[in-house]
Amino acid sequence: MKNKKNLSFLICLLIPLIVGSFSGFITRYEVDGTWFNLLKKPSFNPPNWVFAPVWTTLYTLMGISLYIIWMNSFGEIRKKAVFVFSLQLLLNFLWSILFFYSHLILYGLFDIILLWICICWMIIKFTGINLI
């Protein structure tokens, strides 16, 4: 049983980390590229080196939350929670592609709005499953 829990934890952790790594791989040249460097950014924009550790931490926390949901829900409740999580992860992935790779700022904004709605939906769904 413990090995099954460890495997579930590892899989839940790896899913968002792989998605994040893949989007980072696709957009790696764009983040330091001319297009992004020429954008007008606010004074509080953090330096580029901050993003890798912050996103790694966020994707790790997403994986932990997926594991908590996986272990504490069953049936239709689990199915809906994993669907919302997957939708959020897809929107997260798409934002990097839309903004950095394709330079589609307006579509990136639309994606972020959908992502925030999905995150709120996810918080509501996950809160009903487990209050840590």
Give residue spans per PLM region.
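Hydrophobic alpha-helical segments of small multi-pass membrane proteins
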Residues: 85-93, 108-122
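Membrane-interface helix caps and helix-loop-helix hairpins in membrane proteins
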Residues: 95-107, 127-131
